[in-house]
Amino acid sequence: MINDLWYKNAVVYCLSVETFMDANGDGVGDFQGLQRRLDYLAGLGVNAIWLMPFQASPGVDDGYDVSDYYNIDPRYGTLGDFVEFTHSAKQRGIRVLIDLVVNHTSDQHPWFKQACADKNSRYRDWYVWSEKKPENADEGMVFPGVQKTTWTRDEKSGEYYFHRFFKFQPDLNTGNPHVQAEILKIMGFWIQLGVSGFRMDAVPFVIAEKGADVKESKPQFDLLRSFREFLQWRKGDSIILAEANVVPKENLQYFGDDGDRMQMMFNFHVNQALFYALASADTRPLAKAMNETRERPQTGQWGIFLRNHDELDLGRLTEKQRQAVFSAFGPDKDMQLYDRGIRRRLAPMLGGDTRRLKLAYSLMYSLPGTPVLRYGDEIGMGDDLALEERNCARTPMQWSTEPHGGFTKAEKPVLPVIEGGPYGFEHVNVAAQRRDAESMLNWTERMIRMRKEAPEIGWGSFSVLDCGDTGVLAMRYDWRNNAVVIIHNLHDKPVDISFDPGVGESGRVLIDIADGSDSSADEKGRHNMVIEPFGYRWYRAGGLDYLLKRSDI
């Protein structure tokens, strides 16, 4: 059972094959290059790798426009290379999750081409059509300001097809049983090749009712259960990590009341509140967001993240909160995207302040759920705002001071490596940070190890402690008769705090598992301490014999 729930206390590392490591020198990352860097990832301490899209694609939307679900982009290698990679990852105790993009295909997919060429094609009903342009065609765009409509006329058939995303990404008719069966077939194919699960893209759109006549789309939650049942049958410990940016009251519908749908979901609600907390030094909305997303099945888990490959979506904050985050982290219009988010990486958003960067990641590792780290974040990589839209934060990994950061020997990489300035590969790279005991990379390795040694965070229940300052977040996790207490000061000044851990006699001594600064309670059982600007503490309640006190249930 514990093995089936491996994701509860894991650390996930997200990367793009295209920009991670180029082995054959053509300027594009590939699976052979990724395989050669597995020892690096194993040393970092991650349990799972989440791969962004790598299947065959015209590449108009960074692989999210798939043209063949059963093959990989030839630039990245062959299916044989992929199998060798998954096998090598397994040997190092690393699982592989892959993006599953089944809300839509590329308009170059053979299914869509046949659907356009012949109205009687078996693939016609695999997509969503309308004889005339629906009245609401200018509503519901995913990319406002860039996207003009969700319905586009197909010149061959004269009818309009639906696309929630760009016009070159026609939506699959996921209400069609034949499409549903094909999705299961796709999942089964990649499970057979060694993957341990999927990060399912755009889940609310996948399960939505689609069609010109649909006025109020009702989610088809039974689809999620069928996906889960299929995976349980094929490989019991495989999972789906759902991208579902929904309001908290809908979360249980995605997890399933009995935990029979999605095993994991990204916690967008907490993510947005976390950035507001970092911008304002007010932790109350963050504590509120954690409480609002507290309820989940015992087998369910949140994916906790800071930045991902998309823009930082602030759409669920209030207007005042959103403007505060924009002002702090993305004041220029060039830093913003789609009227709702920021397209920067975290390090430049925080002004390169290592104290704030470590504070932010310490928060990520300590929030309820499983941390998801993005490639390059472990060394504090920057962004290139000269690149279009989201590409500014998708630049190649910076390995060394060699040309193009050691990513490729080609004259021209697939995307330019950041060069010059404080975030250039000359200054920010893996090789240099390996030699520096106080580097971001070595700190991240220590933090991942510490997080994995605190299963209370992944498995236990949490309480927010009153420490007398709204700019300080103090939390306690309880699991199997063990407790950890974690404190973060979001102020840019030192703060005096006082708190009761709330665990009785075992809370009189707090052992610092981060730097050894233990704390003893006063005669009233309260701990009094000064937390430095942007400081944090990780404590374990009781003595270091906690493992002997841990109960079996």
Question: Language-model features: where?
Answer:
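Active-site and adjacent substrate-binding regions of carbohydrate-active enzymes
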Residues: M1-I553
